[in-house]
């Protein structure tokens, strides 16, 4: 039962779906995001030829023409240490080698802001943008969000740039025609077509994602490219594919535009993502869980607890309520709820429609600032009071409110319990959830270093790979 519970107010890390970039020394290669999914299909971020009924009246030319000139090629250059001979390896003499990865991006403003995937530019020493008319620009990384795999870049141009406008991904319908535009296999802007196959797809198995699923062909190098409707409006950022080979075999996945837009707007305004929380604990209903909880509903979000003092608590949400809609958006599973909350900010008011004792009720809930974060290796961290910090004679840190159940025994055997503090992550002082998010974004695929102050005041440093 405990595994069923999901803490809605916690912004889970997106590392579960972080898939490796295919990079080779001295030559460019397309960055591909892959997700292992049992022995079934795996998942890659990235385009098969389709043959459409010649009798269809759908015209894709307007959307294609509006989009191809705003989709760009992204080249990510990194430097890594390597050994050129056995002697170098034996004596520890390493040399820096250049690695290049490529992907796609979408210009979203005439002054050069570009949205792409975080995994496309991760670890870059330099980023080069090539537009559809073969002009090249050096790009500045403005910010990233590991949770949603979204990054914001900026280029400077003397001319106004072609750009794509955001559409409303909430209004996109299953069965609706869409175009995927990107730069697969280092080609210039390439357009493929398909339909929306599903919405609110969670590929991680941890209820942390909410993708648009399409059958538009997407291949290595398409990561960060545009998913647009037939009006040419941006409704998603192509991020992953379902495949066992690394190439397209039927399904691709995109971050919904409403989520991507919220992320980049927050990065522009605050430098990081501001998450609004509801303040409830629970999980999605299905036939098994419904039986466990003694309810006859098999869809919706079942509230097992309400956090004291949160917006949900003040509004009157109660344990046992089944959330079915928020602001008119149907909540049939957790990824629906997660996807909706990822588009909202602290202080936003939302109308929550829920089932209580067989009666539909509605309440207005004010979302609050995210004050906690989950690090899977250790557990849930919360912003603490000054008194709690003073009790351990420390000036900053996040307090460990709940140990990871998976690793609890190991931590407790080392004297780490709830109430301990994480004061540093990757050599960065941690005084807020935003500090922790930024530090973790620098971690990906590297050694993770965490400084912990025990409840007895002892400070210990841990390293994880």
Question: Can you describe what each PLM-predicted range is?
Answer:
Residues 3-319, 325-349, 355-362, 366-396, ...:
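Serine-dependent protease modules
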Residues 281, 464-465:
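A beta-hairpin/wing motif
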Residues 320, 419:
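Conserved catalytic motifs of ABC-family nucleotide-binding domains
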Residues 333, 432-435:
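Alpha-helix N-cap recognition
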Residues 421-423:
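Helix-turn-helix DNA-binding module
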Residues 441, 450-453:
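Short, exposed beta-strand-loop hairpins at the edges of beta-sheets
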Residues 456-464:
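Short, low-complexity, Pro/Ser/Thr/Gly-rich segments in the mature regions of secreted, periplasmic
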């Amino acid at each position: 039962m405990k595994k069923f519970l999901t803490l809605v107010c916690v912004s889970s890390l997106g590392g579960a779906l972080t898939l490796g970039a295919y990079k080779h020394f001295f030559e460019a290669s397309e960055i591909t995001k892959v997700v292992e999914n049992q022995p079934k299909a795996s998942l890659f971020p990235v385009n098969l030829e389709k043959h459409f009924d010649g009798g269809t009246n759908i015209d894709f030319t307007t959307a294609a023409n509006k989009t191809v000139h705003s989709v760009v090629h992204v080249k990510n250059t990194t430097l890594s240490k390597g050994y050129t001979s056995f002697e170098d390896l034996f004596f520890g003499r390493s040399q820096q080698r250049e690695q290049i990865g490529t992907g796609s991006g979408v210009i979203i403003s005439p002054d050069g802001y570009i949205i792409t995937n975080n995994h496309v530019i991760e670890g870059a020493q330099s980023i080069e943008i090539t537009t559809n008319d073969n002009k090249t620009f050096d790009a500045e990384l403005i910010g990233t969000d590991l949770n949603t795999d979204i990054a914001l870049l900026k280029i400077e141009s003397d001319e106004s740039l072609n750009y794509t406008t955001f559409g409303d991904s909430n209004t996109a319908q299953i069965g609706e025609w869409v175009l995927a535009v990107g730069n697969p296999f280092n080609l210039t802007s390439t357009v493929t077509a398909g339909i929306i196959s599903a919405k609110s797809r969670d590929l991680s198995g941890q209820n942390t994602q909410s993708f648009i699923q399409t059958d538009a062909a997407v291949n290595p190098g398409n990561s960060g490219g545009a998913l647009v409707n037939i009006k040419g409006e941006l409704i998603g950022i192509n991020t992953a594919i379902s495949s066992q080979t690394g190439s397209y075999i039927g399904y691709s996945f995109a971050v919904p535009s409403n989520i991507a837009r919220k992320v980049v707007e927050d990065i522009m305004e605050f430098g990081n993502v501001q998450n609004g929380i509801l303040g409830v604990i629970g999980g999605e209903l299905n036939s098994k869980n419904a039986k466990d909880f003694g309810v006859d509903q098999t869809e919706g979000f079942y509230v097992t607890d309400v956090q004291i003092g949160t917006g949900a608590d003040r509004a009157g949400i109660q344990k046992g309520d089944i959330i079915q809609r928020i602001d008119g958006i149907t909540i049939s599973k957790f990824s629906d709820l997660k996807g909706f909350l990822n588009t909202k900010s602290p202080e936003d008011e939302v109308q929550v429609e829920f089932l209580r004792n067989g009666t539909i009720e509605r309440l207005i809930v004010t979302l609050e600032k995210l004050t906690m974060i989950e690090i899977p290796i250790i557990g849930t961290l919360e912003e603490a009071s000054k008194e709690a910090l003073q009790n351990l004679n420390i000036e900053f840190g996040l307090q460990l409110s709940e140990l990871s159940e998976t690793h609890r025994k190991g931590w407790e055997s080392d004297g780490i319990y709830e109430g301990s503090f994480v004061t540093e992550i990757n050599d960065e002082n941690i005084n807020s959830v935003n500090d922790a998010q930024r530090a973790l974004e620098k971690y990906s695929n590297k050694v993770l270093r965490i400084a912990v102050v025990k409840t007895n005041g002892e400070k210990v440093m841990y390293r994880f790979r």
